[in-house]
Amino acid sequence: MNVNSSSNRGEAILAALKTQFPGAELDEERQTPEQVTITVKINLLPDVVHYLYYQHDGWLPVLFGNDERTLNGHYAVYYALSMEGAEKCWIVVKALVDADSREFPSVTPRVPAAVWGEREIRDMYGLIPVGLPDQRRLVLPDDWPEDMHPLRKDAMDYRLRPEPTTDSETYAFINEGNSDARVIPVGPLHITSDEPGHFRLFVDGEQIVDADYRLFYVHRGMEKLAETRMGYNEVTFLSDRVCGICGFAHSVAYTNSVENALGIEVPQRAHTIRSILLEVERLHSHLLNLGLSCHFVGFDTGFMQFFRVREKSMTMAELLIGSRKTYGLNLIGGVRRDILKEQRLQTLKLVREMRADVSELVEMLLATPNMEQRTQGIGILDRQIAREYSPVGPLIRGSGFARDLRFDHPYADYGNIPKTLFTFTGGDVFSRVMVRVKETFDSLAMLEFALDNMPDTPLLTEGFSYKPHAFALGFVEAPRGEDVHWSMLGDNQKLFRWRCRAATYANWPVLRYMLRGNTVSDAPLIIGSLDPCYSCTDRVTLVDVRKRQSKTVPYKEIERYGIDRNRSPLK
């Protein structure tokens, strides 16, 4: 892509990098005026990422691998940094990995935010991050063959069926609070559970001294599916299904990545329609989480009332696109359907109704003593931990960091829509609740402005051609935080590589630090304050480090204890 050098962002940072590490950069390629990919010497990879992260206000939203043996004879690892200092831009640090040794130096000891990404690269490509502190599998199940790595370009034998797992547990849960704790294996998952996760809380009496958890029980292989079986616009509809609530955010991030790779100019009206639907999703998600927060503190009247008002956000979606879920609207280059005058007027009426309803509910919520008593000082995300791990969304804004892609890297129509960035410094559950409360009102204001100021332009840019192996990032500030996608186009009308990173993926690593020092009854509230993008937790193993005893407890029992705070499951 040809980029006008006079408008390029990040040049001062790149100049400082070259001064700090002479000869480290091997190649530099611009994708957009605010996106650049630099290839560095592999031995300097940790130093370069560490320098950009800590010396230039970088954050690490996503890292990923790529099998580029057919392109350059190597594997590659990419570390995408969002630079959020004085000069806001994206710098993607790339290193080529030898195809025979498959080794590269781990960045995690220098930048802890890299830990999950490097574990996933190890699983999916068989690359070896030398020095990675946590060598456990992240994505692949225990019975997956050691020599089969799903995202390599090698042919896979899909007829393979792994051997049944044994009764012996092979995944080592880590307890940093007390290494002498005795752990008992947990039974199988409930077959009726959606998106289960397994938590282990290490406790001393009622106090949590540490926590560990395992997820990815229902990994769907969407990236592999997109690369092998779907055309470019078909992936748009697949990305809609990444999340049950913020699917539209993912489809915007995906289409944005392809549009950035090809330099496609999206019509302004399409940008505005995308922004409107993104804020409808934010209303839906935030009202749902506020309702669940009421439930977790035992305020079920508030739970039911928030869910009642939330229905209006789904009615908005149905008015605007014909479905209560915001599916099927995006295409590469724009959108498929317009918002007509009658739809716009009815939506504006709903916005006014919701503003009055939410105002009344928030006043009731904040007047409920149980809310402040149960949420203030609970589940604190320390600022230093937040800085090291790059969490996102209301979680990071509740710890005082002003991070929001709508402000840092405006996309769609967010450069034109008036908006306010809300932060709270408490770092606790209450701060995260208040971020969502403020953002709910701001979303209503943004919807009102966007619906009243829709430009008169076409909806879709057509007639462009796909360029093999062009690549770029796409991103969206979804309700839970930033969704970041990276797409590399192929030469067969399919993607060569698609990396889709949902917001919750960035938030899970800090959860154990938020649970430490709190009580077992607070665990559901703390976990819920992440607004985690999964439906339920299978069960929890409680390990009493003082008595050297452990007990497996159904999650519903922990949830019940968190609400009424009597009849402890530990007794």
Task: Please identify what each model-predicted range represents.
Residues M1-D210, M371-Q373, R387, S443, ...:
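Terminal low-complexity/charged segments
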Residues I42-L45, P112, L138-K571:
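Metal/cofactor-centered catalytic core regions of large enzymes
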